[in-house]
Amino acid sequence: MKKPINTVAPDAKIGKNVRIWNYAYVGSKTVIGDNVKIGSLAHVDYDVRIGSGTKIEGSAYIPPMSRIGKNVFIGPAAVLTNDPYPPSRRMIGVTIEDGAVIGARAVIKAGVRVGRRAVVAMGSVVTRDVPAGMVVMGVPARVAYTRKEFDVKMKEWESGS
């Protein structure tokens, strides 16, 4: 098997059993925990922290200074931003707490905190903090239901009911 073609800054700290797929980028001073997967064409910029067990799908963008917790899922082409008023000289990352789920093509505004085990539905635009254990969806994203309800729906889907 050929070694994946990607770019990882020499001063990035990469944990054990990390898989970085083809054409992904990991920036300077980024720290990645154990058992993390980063999909093809994903861009993880400089000074990012990613907790163990997190999965970042292809074409996702994680901006500088973002903090991603443990066991987070970030769907394909999700975009976290770092400048609410571009092009500003002041930047701030996004914080995603442990166990959160970010759906495909979701966009999260700079400085937003996504709470523990919260879910951002695919295609949503998040402009405010997301409370822990809640599911948000829409443009702009609003609370739709709880993570507990989401987990029930997922189990029903997986069982084919």
Segments (PLM) and residue ranges:
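Flexible, glycine/small-residue-enriched loop-and-beta-strand segment within the central core
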Residues: 1-5, 9-10, 20-114, 139-140, ...
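Short conserved catalytic/interaction loops centered on acidic-Pro-aromatic/His motifs
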Residues: 115-117, 133
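Binuclear metal-ion centers of metallo-dependent hydrolases, dominated by the metallo-beta-lactamase
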Residues: 120
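Leucine-rich solenoid repeat scaffolds
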Residues: 125-127
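Conserved beta-strand-loop-alpha-helix hinge in the C-terminal portion
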Residues: 132-156
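ABC ATPase nucleotide-binding domains
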Residues: 158-161
